[in-house]
């Protein structure tokens, strides 16, 4: 978010918009308020409430039941899925949940540049980075995987290799878990719009009821 202040009273709406962007998990980013020197010299009687302390809560968006059930059915139908952990996993503090999810169903996990450090490199199901800046292990596994589960990733060209990495299997499907509706619908993905942590927990509970396991044997080792 960027705004240039031309009148002192404009600061009130500009600050509200800045905090709106900073606390929006889908559209979050930097906020810049440009305050020219001449405006700084002007006076304005701001109301007292404008200076009172306010704590902004970042809400966790829960995915719609229909989308959660759709995600569950996609994963159940997959024999060799792969999870891609993006920057949204770090923002959601969902690293532990991702590891629990992968261990429960024997799903390999790769990390994007933005998502790196959300999981320890020593995690037994981690196959390292993916895409043009990734490693051999994750990119090779993509050849045979039938479902990509993107969690908190924007699926940019560094991750997809301009689609040349993720789409070597012509029958591959994509499930995108993201707080942003735009990023959740990239690559013709089946969307599941919600916070990474709570959405994975909801999907995991249903998959455990179904006793789901992947068909991987020693490929991940």
Predicted regions and their residues:
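Short beta-strand elements at the ligand-binding edges of bilobed clamshell
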Residues: 3, 56-62, 121-134, 185-200
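Short beta-strand segments
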Residues: 6, 32-36, 84, 150-152, ...
């Amino acid at each position: 978010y960027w705004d240039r202040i031309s009148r002192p009273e404009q600061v009130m709406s500009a600050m509200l918009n800045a905090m709106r962007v900073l606390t929006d998990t889908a559209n979050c980013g930097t906020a810049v308020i440009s305050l020219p020197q001449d405006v700084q010299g002007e006076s304005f009687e701001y109301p007292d409430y404008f200076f009172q302390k306010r704590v902004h809560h970042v809400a966790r968006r829960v995915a719609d039941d229909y989308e959660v059930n759709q995600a569950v059915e996609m994963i159940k139908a997959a024999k060799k899925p792969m999870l891609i952990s993006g920057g949204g996993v770090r923002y959601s503090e969902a690293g532990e949940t991702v590891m629990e999810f992968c261990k429960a169903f024997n799903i390999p996990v790769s990390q994007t540049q933005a998502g790196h450090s959300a999981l320890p490199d020593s995690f037994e199901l981690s196959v390292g980075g993916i895409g043009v800046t990734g490693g051999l292990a994750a990119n090779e596994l993509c050849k045979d995987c039938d479902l990509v589960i993107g969690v908190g990733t924007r699926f940019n060209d560094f991750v997809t290799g301009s689609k040349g990495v993720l789409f070597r299997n012509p029958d591959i499907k994509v499930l995108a878990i993201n707080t942003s509706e735009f990023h959740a619908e990239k690559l013709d993905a089946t969307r599941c719009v919600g916070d990474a942590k709570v959405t994975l927990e909801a999907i995991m509970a249903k998959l455990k009821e179904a006793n789901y396991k992947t068909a991987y044997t020693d490929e991940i080792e």
